[in-house]
Amino acid sequence: LPGPGGLGVRLAARLRELIRAGGALRPGTVLPPTRAVAAEFGLSRGVVVAAYEQLAAEGFLAGRQGSGTRVADLGAGARPAPKAPPPEEAARPGVPDLGGFPRGRWLAAYRQALTAMADGDLGYGDPRGHARLRTELAAHLRAFRGADASPDALLVVGGAADGLTLLADTLAVCGRPRIAVEDPSSPRTRALLRRRGLEVTGVPVDGEGLAVDALREPGRLGAVLLTPAHQYPAGVPLSAGRRQALVRLAREHGVLLIEDDYNGAFRYDREPPGCLQGLAPDVTALLGSVSKTLAPALRLGWLLAPPAWAPRLVHDRALTHPTGHTLDHLAFAHLLHTGDYTAHLRRTRRRYQSRRLHLTTELAAAAPGFTPLGTPGGLHLPVALPPWSREAEVLAAVRAEGYDVQGLGACALTPPPPDRPGGGLVIGFAALTPTAITHLVGVARAAGGPPSSPGAPPPPG
């Protein structure tokens, strides 16, 4: 299997070529089981599974229960494969592989919800969300995120940003409008907090996450917002020592810790660390959603509130959102109950791990001086640029090709001058094909490499 990238990437590329050429792999051809392929070619089964899943997500393969994996019919009469997101959305940090959304499982769950729901479920219901989903979600968070979760403490919200808006409004009404955020962090999140009337102050981030010792005047803080599982954009987890120090500070000064469990489900070198809320449920509000694991369009998330905050949050939620999207709640509860959601997470982890590996391999081979940062996890890769390049020039080049890569400078509370040498990129890789990854890296290298760098490769076709 010659060519760039890891074994899974090369196997997928070879199968893709054979399918396009016709011959032995014609539409309807049943592929050998993954175990058989792995044994015949001396590969791990995980490599073969990742290659099959990659091609299924691209529309080259199709699978049916009990009939194996087949070459999809790509002829004119075939059902068109779901369209891939445009390159600019695919490269945006945090965008999942939307082609991998489990449409069949979701449709089956939706039908089951419609069939089984009681007439009363069509009413206004509980502002916290349907009890069945809160029960299933609490069990999932206990088992997979180490949370101290009960159904009564959970609110089902319209995504993490919706839950953060509820918390921000409550902080403002309670006269605690000062909030500390990580520096660097998401510019959109900071804009949301300011829009809700909060005073935002920054706290530096290093290799261990948020620098707790740098928190100034903690007695004046209402809350600290952080991403401890996989910091955005630096990609580092909050260390155990920092977690303990932050919890002590929160309890001593009455500070609410708002944990955005950003990318908490995705770690590729080991099991992801448990959530901070499991260590300190009395002072931590946990935010999560399915925007990264399933699709942003579902607008499904959760807020696990500390006991002292739950009554006020439920009261405020009832004023603006007296009920949720019950059908979606029941469908997601079905996915959780049957194990389909956790199976989907396992599949997507393998796929994203393969794409991240392809990106880091391409950077190492084709872009010397471009240094990946952070731990192996999440849906984005922070990359430090070499000192001879300029972030603004590299961003302009990749965006001109349609890739909405973000700059590290924009994530700082005080952005650096645009002509500053070096800088960095934040590349969303989860929805990029291997061909697009190779092209993007080539464009970035041509714009940010040494003066003698060759030109960029042609765009993927």
Question: What is the role of each PLM region?
Answer:
Residues 1-113, 122, 318-324, 333-336, ...:
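N-terminal basic, amphipathic alpha-helical segments
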Residues 76, 184-188, 409-414:
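Short, polar loop motifs at secondary-structure junctions
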Residues 106, 286-349:
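Conserved core segment of the aminotransferase class I/II
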Residues 120-253, 265-267, 271-285, 352, ...:
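Conserved core of the PLP fold type I
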Residues 160, 206-207, 211, 215, ...:
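Hydrophobic multi-pass inner-membrane translocation pores used for secretion
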Residues 179-181, 258, 406:
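Short hydrophobic beta-strand element within catalytic cores of glycosyltransferases
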